Design a protein with these regions (language model features):
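C-terminal domain-boundary segment and adjacent tail
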Residues: 122-196
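Metal-dependent polysaccharide deacetylase catalytic core of the NodB/CE4 family, i.e.
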Residues: 1-98, 103-115, 197
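Bacterial c-di-GMP phosphodiesterase catalytic domain signature
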Residues: 118
């Protein structure tokens, strides 16, 4: 449900692995087929939940980028995204702390990709004010849109179907993240929705 709302709101969805494993650690670091399975099943699951193809965009869990997996993703024409600024919002509970963390780091760097997690209530509550401060500071929120969508691989689609792990949960701690972002990138999101990392 949430994933479909994100798509309906005009957002771009990528993937982040099937079970959020650090692909730079064993067994994934030494078993490339297992690492590929983790990536591909994640993409298949998001595609199935969305009901439409997703962007060929990927971020590694723990921000670890194993060279062999970078090569694999390149062969699949999947763009990898990292981050320049980690909000560390998973360590904070108050919106003011999240805003201060992001703005302090952003002012030092001047620009960059900001990592935030939508499952944190403090993050969702901080987002409207953070976006206001970004706009007031002359920063832009950029909506990444792919030239073409990702084609998932049938064998991994089948694996996901057999797992039956797709959640039907359609709530997050603060159910306004997509709505808030949509106001800043020109989307027309539904009254209640959220985004998944």
């Amino acid at each position: 449900q949430i994933t479909k709302q994100v798509i309906e709101a005009g957002m771009t969805l990528g993937s982040h692995t099937w079970s959020h494993k650090d692909l730079a650690r064993k067994p994934y670091a030494t078993d490339l087929d297992l690492a590929k399975q983790e990536i591909e099943m994640g993409a298949s699951a998001v595609h199935m939940a969305a009901g439409v193809p997703i962007a060929p965009f990927f971020r590694f869990p723990s921000l670890q980028h194993p060279p062999a997996m970078l090569i694999y993703l390149g062969e699949r024409n999947i763009a990898t995204f990292s981050t320049d600024i980690d909000s560390f919002d998973f360590r904070m509970h108050k919106p003011e702390q999240v805003i201060k963390s992001v703005m302090t780091k952003l002012e030092k760097r001047g620009k960059g990709i900001i990592l935030m997690h939508d499952f944190q209530r403090g993050t969702a509550e901080a987002l409207p004010e953070l976006l206001r401060q970004l706009k007031a500071g002359g920063y832009k929120v950029v909506h990444m849109v792919p030239r073409q969508m990702l084609t998932t691989l049938p064998q991994y689609d089948d694996m996901v179907m057999k797992q039956d792990k797709l959640s039907s949960n359609n709530t997050r701690p603060e159910n306004n993240v997509v709505h808030t972002i949509g106001q800043y990138i020109g989307g027309a999101p539904p009254a209640t929705s959220d985004m998944h990392e």
